[in-house]
Amino acid sequence: MSQIGGATCTWRYLGRFVTLGIYASVALFVWYTLVPTRSKHKDSIAINNNNADPATALIPVHTKNVVIYAATKFFGHPITTERFLATCPDVQNYCRITQEESEFDNADAVLFHNADYRGSTDKFKKMKSQRKPGVPYVLWSLESPTNDMFRPDSHMINWTMTYRTDSDVWAPYGTIVKLKNPVEVDLNAIWEGKTKTATWLASNCITQNHRFDLIKKIIDNGFEIDIWGNCGKQVSQCAGVDNQESPCVLELIKPYKFYISMENSNCKDYVTEKFWKALNDRMTIPIVLARKYYKDLGVPDSAYIAVDDYATLDEFLAHVKKVNKEKDLFLSYHQWRKEWKVIIGSGFSGWCTLCNKLQDKDYILKNPKSYKDVAWWHSFEMCNNQIASKYL
């Protein structure tokens, strides 16, 4: 029976696995440029060629020791080398992160986590006035524009490090690659392991894209969804676990055929771990709001179900109910596993990529770049939060 209640099972940002990116350069002197589009991302190409983790896909020859000054905390928590470069231990041999203000003058890059940036403080005023050529200022963001309105000064930011494919340092929550050779997949075992219909784990119940309203309407129309976390029942067997990387959470979700992978906002390239993990070892069929955002990231159409493929909610419900009952139809959504592989973003691997990009100081100086208005780049115009409204 579908369950909606009020309990807690939150997973904070520090537990999240995500790769994240950076901004850099100089306000009055030099503005640098890195690869602006996904098609040109060397780290993206390396992933596609080698089926590698984004954290280690591009490891250049070590030419210099790098120091990154973290000018902010990460949701109030310290930013340390040990935690944020954990996915690339080899990089730690020549790159380190510091939050000591005494090292600001010697840093190779200065990084700001958008949610912790407070531009009016004396500390940040000093950073604006004492910039050095060849030292990029990097904006790091995990969140969509709907939940994250960073407002730095014009031309302050040189590089962006986000999930967006047009970031200067691309830090995706996950990606998918075509295998060189098909592999065998026991599809019958997937079907036999599915004893429940659909589930959703969530901590954010009130969102501008009305996803919870749509989920409740889907339930009201006879499609069973078990809801866990802040928006539903407490995950009793996972007491004390507050992040989605826990094996306990994997075991909770694995018996379900479908996972509700609707994001808290519908924005360009904003596809988080909830989708990639559902697709990967949890062996579920993700249900998403809009196909465009996943198609743009190269996910095979047959790997998920998008609500906006259907003219009405009744048409959508008729299809998912049929998939739920018919084995062959259900397994058609798992055929992709024979030819594709999901790569989960390793959390903070954007830092690893940043360390590597900072190796080439000559390139930085010869390719100046800055954002006149990074707030526009990361704006509401990149989002469409009205998709669910059509079905309410």
UniProtKB/Swiss-Prot annotation:
GO terms for molecular function: alpha-(1->3)-fucosyltransferase activity; fucosyltransferase activity. Pathway: Protein modification; protein glycosylation. The chain crosses the membrane at residues 13-35. One of its GO terms (biological process) is protein glycosylation. One of its GO terms (cellular component) is Golgi cisterna membrane. Disruption phenotype: No visible phenotype. Loss of several tetra-fucosylated N-glycans. Loss of tetra- and tri-fucosylated N-glycans in a fut-8 or fut-1 mutant background. fut-1, fut-6 and fut-8 triple mutants lack all N-glycan core fucose with only one fucose present in the bisecting galactose, thus resulting in the loss of tetra-, tri- and bi-fucosylated N-glycans. Its main location: Golgi. Optimum temperature is 23 degrees Celsius. Very low activity at 37 degrees Celsius. Residues 1-12 are cytoplasmic. It comes from the Eukaryota. Its EC number is 2.4.1.-. The keyword Cytoplasm does not apply. Inhibited by divalent metal cations. It is found in: Golgi apparatus, Golgi stack membrane. Glycans are attached at residue 158. Belongs to the glycosyltransferase 10 family. PANTHER family: ALPHA-(1,3)-FUCOSYLTRANSFERASE C-RELATED. This is Alpha-(1,3)-fucosyltransferase fut-6. The lineage of its organism: Eukaryota, Metazoa, Ecdysozoa, Nematoda, Chromadorea. The gene is fut-6.
